[in-house]
């Protein structure tokens, strides 16, 4: 038993004994140029903790959301020991990805820091109560499990309008 914010921090920026979430992604390996393990880590963190689906944006600008290919790669690059080259539909673009968190208002990742420090920064940004996105995502998932439908639907598209913003804010 531990507070949720500590649990999330340990999953995203793991100590040796809690590396399963991030390291567990590596068993699949690199699927194709757009689905490197770093991109898979970014997709998982975005979906689980932020309620965002980056799968389309990992290959091309998303058709189902406003997320862009460069944003998905910049987020994936936080998880990478080397600078990722952006691939559009498995074809190299010749552009190198930056390193940025998906929501700039949460803070700025030190692009020059080593991977472990970037993951610590990311974890710290995600759990801060200032933005509350992590907690809204959690509340929405629990509500959906208990009530059969989320306050925001689908639960992996937290950019959609909630049917009750006041309730979501209060619960989070």
Predicted regions and their residues:
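Short, structured secondary-structure elements
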Residues: 1-109, 119-123, 131-172
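Glycine-rich phosphate/pyrophosphate-binding loop
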Residues: 112-115
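Cell-envelope and extracellular/periplasmic
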Residues: 127
